[in-house]
Amino acid sequence: LLYVSDRRGNRIQVFRQNGEYLMERFVRPETGGSGSGFSLQFSRDPEQSLLYLIDGTNQRVWVLRRKDLAILDRFGRPGRQSGEFIRAHMIAIDSKNRMYTGEAGNGRRIQRWVLKGTRPTSSVKPPAEQ
């Protein structure tokens, strides 16, 4: 399956490889301007059961169940402290289940998170700052 993060459309869409549309989930549809669906990443469990969507307008990470795109959780808020975002823009999860979020513009930082279930248990400084 192909999962598409439609930034300005405030949604995730799912298609078969032949282009057949399967489903979509709107995430904060009232968000204007830059939209809410910046980048997405699959969880690292064998089933890849979760999707993590970075929302660079509302400064959040949304957690969705992959099979039906149900929203399970969200975390983050605007700000400059650990666990907060300024222009959140990218998301990645490594093989050790650590999540990385990157910020553009004035944010200019990467935060590293330790995931347990759907939420991070902690955020730590980027390797360059440790």
Regions found by a protein language model. Name each.
Residues 1-130:
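Eukaryotic scaffold repeat domains enriched in small/polar residues
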